[in-house]
Amino acid sequence: MAQNPFKALNINIDKIESALTQNGVTNYSSNVKNERETHISGTYKGIDFLIKLMPSGGNTTIGRASGQNNTYFDEIALIIKENCLYSDTKNFEYTIPKFSDDDRANLFEFLSEEGITITEDNNNDPNCKHQYIMTTSNGDRVRAKIYKRGSIQFQGKYLQIASLINDFMCSILNMKEIVEQKNKEFNVDIKKETIESELHSKLPKSIDKIHEDIKKQLSCSLIMKKIDVEMEDYSTYCFSALRAIEGFIYQILNDVCNPSSSKNLGEYFTENKPKYIIREIHQETINGEIAEVLCECYTYWHENRHGLFHMKPGIADTKTINKLESIAIIDTVCQLIDGGVARLKL
């Protein structure tokens, strides 16, 4: 039996709509049925079609849908195969020499809260204590190996899970360790002092006013900004910066209303297009210039964080950005934080 030419392909699903519409498909639609199956439909050469995308293990199989007109299935599937595969770009290979059981528990809790599924895998490596597979509903997949000597190694694509792992590591490593790890991972020679100097130049009014964790998150994005490698999606460059502005919003809120840890940012803001405003229930406490700064920061955070790797049912709901766009986000975050501190005279 001939091998299915459309099985287990390394498909970037974000590219499918553009590829199909540019090749004659009209009335395009995508419908996520569940984590294992997405239906895409439309009209091609006058014939309505529906085909299935089935993600598994980080790859995707294109399949026929029973009961549908499959006259042009091979042509449509070939358009996807020829135009929507990931290129040979930088993979996520991250090793931490010392990673305690508590670190592992905290990482897994953090990833689970972000919607990542973690399952223990068969361990065939005699040097490993445990192996885990981390997955998302859109097919992103990272393998974690915990070695007997106390180190942890991650392997996968530089997508959503990798960005979340980087985000977590920024919270537990110091700046020297973060720089050393990135130098090793990307074979570069970035100096800690260079990052500190750039951070000071980006935040002349706020460097001594913002929380240390915010500075560390911004530093992580400044490090990534200096790394010149090809990636399918440069969201990972600015992910930490968006975490930083999220932290800045919480820092301001803590000064005026001391929010409980159970509250998320959405409880303070409501949409009033084209921006967000403070919910009426909080306007007595949060108003004036503080409210203006908070709403500007939240509107920008919401637009970008929710469009990148924020959890959605399918990968078609996420946005792929290039390096220049990611750098622009980093720079804008720094401007919003520094300008916000100046306006509030913190």
UniProtKB/Swiss-Prot annotation:
Disulfide bonds: none annotated. Keywords: Endonuclease, Hydrolase, Nuclease, Plasmid, Toxin-antitoxin system. The keyword Transcription does not apply. InterPro entries: RnlA/LsoA-toxin_DBD, RnlA_toxin_N, RnlA_toxin_NRD. It comes from the Bacteria. The keyword Nucleotidyltransferase does not apply. One of its GO terms (molecular function) is RNA endonuclease activity. Its EC number is 3.1.-.-. It holds the Pfam family RnlA_toxin_N. Toxic component of a type II toxin-antitoxin (TA) system. A stable (half-life over 20 minutes) endoribonuclease that degrades mRNA. Degradation may be translation-stimulated. Overexpression in the absence of cognate antitoxin LsoB causes retarded growth and mRNA degradation, this effect is mitigated upon coexpression with antitoxin LsoB or enterobacteria phage T4 Dmd. Degrades late enterobacteria phage T4 mRNAs, protecting the host against T4 reproduction. Can form a complex with cognate antitoxin LsoB and with enterobacteria phage T4 antitoxin Dmd. This plasmid is only found in Sakai-derived strains of E.coli O157. This is mRNA endoribonuclease LsoA. It comes from Escherichia coli O157:H7. The gene is lsoA.
